[in-house]
């Protein structure tokens, strides 16, 4: 494991707020967390399903921001594997891929792509295509996410399916007016952060949507998920990907970003809105008992996070560091 004491010091000297993804990464593999968040050697995630998820979120929750966040490519987007190679080539700042033979071959070897070919020229031919060249040009020139028209059309269709579900759209159609007695506060894609009394680190996250209803004294938090499985598998997915951890973090974030009176007296509810691989849509309610259990579990995990953070120990997951694990 590569160690850098100077970067460790810089990390500890700056206030770090854990997001769902960074906390999940630390719990899964402290070594990967160290590489990505302390050494800052984090690879940009360019997988197609992740990009499509962001497009759907934007079209539904922030449609006016779409043009500032995405560039639509006239031709087809390369595969995820090829895009990772092209992304590696960005650092050379050379738009002419024909002048990057050695760099392309090195990137292909690193990503173990087209290594079954015997001839380097065949490997290069797979990358140095007109379609890839066009994508690479956009990659160098644009700071936005790049999608193609097929992706945009597919995402628009999925958003329309969500809108066709009246039960789901009732969660996304609260209207706020300028009337000073308006009882609703609505927030979409809201970046929140907070300090934690017991710890030197804090929490942060972008909450898809939450609605504060001052008439009913309720706060409804809504998280939109695009799933590669069926909605029938979503309860297991919540455990597998620790979506419950994300929900618990969001509850704390929202609770700490409202007044103390609201935090103490308003009831918080949480809903997962899911569109699955078959374009089935459903809003999963989370019971109060389940939310309380998730929040309790988060507080237990914060002790583990605190151990790694304060002791600066990232060699192994917590349970392997504090006791012997027996099979």
Report each predicted region and the residues it spans:
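Single, functionally critical "micro-switch" positions that shape active/binding sites
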Residues: 56, 207, 250
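Hydrophobic/aromatic-lined pockets within catalytic cores
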Residues: 60-65, 196, 211, 226-229, ...
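Short acidic (Asp/Glu) and glycine-rich catalytic loops that position anionic groups and cofactors
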Residues: 34-37, 226-230, 278-280
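Glycine- and acidic
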Residues: 40-42, 230-236, 283
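Short regulatory "switch" loops immediately downstream of catalytic or recognition motifs
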Residues: 160-171, 212-214, 252-260
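Non-catalytic protein-protein interaction segments used by genome-maintenance enzymes to assemble
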Residues: 181, 185-244
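Metal-dependent nuclease catalytic cores that hydrolyze phosphodiester bonds in DNA/RNA
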Residues: 1-204
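Metal-dependent nuclease catalytic regions and adjoining charged, substrate-binding loops involved
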Residues: 93-106, 159, 236-244, 249-327
């Amino acid at each position: 494991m590569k160690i850098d004491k100077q970067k460790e010091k810089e990390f500890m000297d700056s206030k770090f707020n854990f997001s769902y993804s960074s906390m999940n990464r630390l719990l899964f593999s402290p070594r990967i967390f160290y590489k990505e968040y302390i050494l800052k050697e984090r690879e940009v995630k360019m997988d197609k399903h992740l990009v499509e998820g962001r497009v759907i979120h934007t079209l539904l929750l922030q449609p006016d921001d779409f043009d500032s966040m995405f560039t639509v490519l006239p031709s087809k987007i390369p595969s995820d594997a090829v895009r990772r190679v092209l992304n590696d080539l960005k650092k050379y700042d050379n738009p002419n891929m024909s002048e990057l033979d050695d760099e392309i071959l090195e990137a292909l070897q690193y990503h173990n792509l087209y290594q079954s070919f015997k001839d380097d020229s065949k490997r290069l031919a797979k990358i140095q295509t007109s379609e890839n060249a066009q994508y690479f040009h956009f990659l160098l020139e644009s700071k936005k996410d790049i999608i193609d028209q097929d992706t945009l059309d597919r995402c628009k269709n999925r958003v329309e399916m969500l809108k066709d579900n009246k039960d789901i759209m009732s969660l996304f159609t609260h209207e706020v007016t300028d009337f000073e007695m308006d009882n609703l506060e609505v927030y979409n894609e809201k970046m929140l952060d907070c300090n934690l009394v017991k710890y030197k680190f804090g929490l942060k996250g972008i909450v898809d949507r939450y609605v504060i209803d001052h008439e009913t004294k309720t706060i409804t938090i809504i998280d939109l998920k695009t799933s590669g499985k069926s909605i029938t598998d979503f309860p297991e997915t919540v455990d597998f990907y620790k979506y419950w951890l994300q929900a618990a973090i969001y509850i704390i974030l929202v609770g700490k970003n409202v007044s103390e009176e609201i935090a103490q007296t308003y009831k918080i509810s949480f809903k997962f809105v899911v569109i699955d691989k078959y374009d089935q849509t459903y809003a999963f309610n989370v019971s109060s008992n389940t939310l309380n259990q998730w929040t309790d579990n988060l507080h237990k995990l914060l002790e583990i996070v605190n151990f790694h953070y304060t002791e600066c120990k990232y060699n192994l997951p917590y349970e392997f560091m504090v006791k012997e694990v027996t099979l």
